[in-house]
């Protein structure tokens, strides 16, 4: 007794639509508008018939797999899990399936996962780790599909995310000038993150402010190791980059300098246009997903930076932000101690 294999034609007959419409729906054709009621009928027909699309045939016909690969070091932490969930939600809304690869920070496993992603014919790859150890397989991936680095690595030939500091620094310069600040200490990482952008803002010089950069945050030069230098410089304000805890340094300096934290946007609750509040990190990932989708729509285009806007958290905002963060389930999973330094 032969078993009838369910086809797209069977789905079309059950849903009362044409076979071509079922095909366009399954392939997420962006040029075709389908009503929600029709989508529901097709989905119900697929479920009731147990239809399974032939991915290989879809790929041969359309030249695209509608799969995006995402490679992370781990997914157990709240930030990594929020990144993955938010990215998956937006990409799935756009008609893509997302396959996660977890490397556990093992270089050999990273290479194996990249090979697997290429065998799956992914339409794009989002890589959240440092590309140094896997640049060769990443280059081979990039020859077939867009490769996105979730951090800024300008020395590597891939699309990457760059924080847009210009507007935030200009606003901060006006804020500090209005409070009579004359000496600014820039707390940055060992690579001098943010120094170039800081120097490019003319408002610092126009307001007569002096600044000095303090590179810290490494085992050889911990944050606590610059307290004596800061006391000698006597800053009126601290601007901390790359997650450096300027709040604890401020306390060690007697609490007098203003503390401006530049690492706030990905973690601050943000208001959407409809008035709803979304966790800032989730909104940040949604911005990245929109940029990924734009580049995926033009896969042959030149490699470019995807700008992620940044704003600074000034002292007057901290109480309100603390309350919003403490009421946010995402930050409750981080634990109180992990977020206290963000909003002191």
State each model region's role.
Residues 69-71, 185, 260:
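Short, well-ordered beta-strand segments
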Residues 172-209, 299-321:
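An alpha-beta-alpha
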Residues 12, 46, 91, 139, ...:
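A generic structural signal for well-ordered alpha-helical segments
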Residues 228-344:
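Flexible loop/turn connectors
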Residues 102, 188, 215-217:
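Residue-level recognition of beta-strand->loop/alpha-helix junctions
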Residues 1-64:
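N-terminal helix-turn-helix DNA-binding module of bacterial transcription factors
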Residues 2-3, 63-66, 70-178, 192, ...:
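Alpha-helical recognition/docking segments in bacterial nutrient-uptake
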């Amino acid at each position: 007794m032969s078993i009838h294999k369910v086809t797209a034609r069977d789905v079309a007959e059950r849903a009362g639509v044409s076979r071509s419409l079922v095909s366009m729906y399954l392939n997420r054709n962006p040029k075709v508008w389908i009503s929600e009621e029709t989508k529901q009928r097709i989905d119900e027909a697929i479920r009731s018939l147990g239809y399974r699309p032939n991915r290989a045939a879809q790929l041969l016909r359309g030249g695209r797999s509608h799969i995006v690969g995402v490679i992370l070091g781990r997914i157990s932490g709240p930030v990594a899990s929020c990144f993955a969930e938010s990215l998956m939600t937006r990409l799935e809304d756009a008609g893509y399936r997302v396959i996660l690869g977890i490397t556990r920070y093992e270089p050999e496993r990273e290479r194996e996962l990249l090979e697997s992603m290429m065998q799956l014919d992914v339409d794009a790859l989002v890589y959240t780790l440092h590309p140094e150890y896997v640049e060769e397989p990443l280059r081979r991936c990039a020859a077939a599909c867009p490769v996105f680095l979730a951090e800024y690595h300008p020395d590597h030939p891939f699309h990457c995310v760059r924080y847009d500091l210009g507007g935030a620094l200009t606003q901060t310069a006006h804020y500090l000038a209005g409070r009579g600040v004359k000496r600014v200490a820039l707390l940055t990482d060992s690579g001098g993150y943010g120094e170039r952008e800081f120097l490019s803002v003319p408002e610092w010089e126009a307001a007569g402010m002096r600044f000095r950069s303090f590179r810290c945050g490494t085992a050889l030069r911990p944050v606590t190791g610059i307290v004596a230098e800061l006391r000698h410089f006597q800053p009126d304000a601290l601007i901390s980059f790359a997650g450096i805890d300027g709040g604890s340094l401020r306390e060690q300096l007697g609490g007098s300098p203003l503390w401006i934290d530049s690492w706030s946007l990905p973690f601050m609750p943000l208001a959407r246009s409809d008035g709803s509040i979304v966790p800032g990190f989730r909104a940040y990932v949604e911005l990245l997903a929109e940029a990924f989708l734009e580049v995926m729509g033009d896969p042959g285009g030149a490699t470019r930076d995807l700008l992620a806007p940044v704003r600074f958290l000034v002292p007057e905002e901290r109480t309100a932000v603390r309350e919003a963060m403490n009421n946010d389930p995402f930050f409750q999973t981080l634990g109180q101690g992990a977020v206290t330094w963000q909003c002191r």
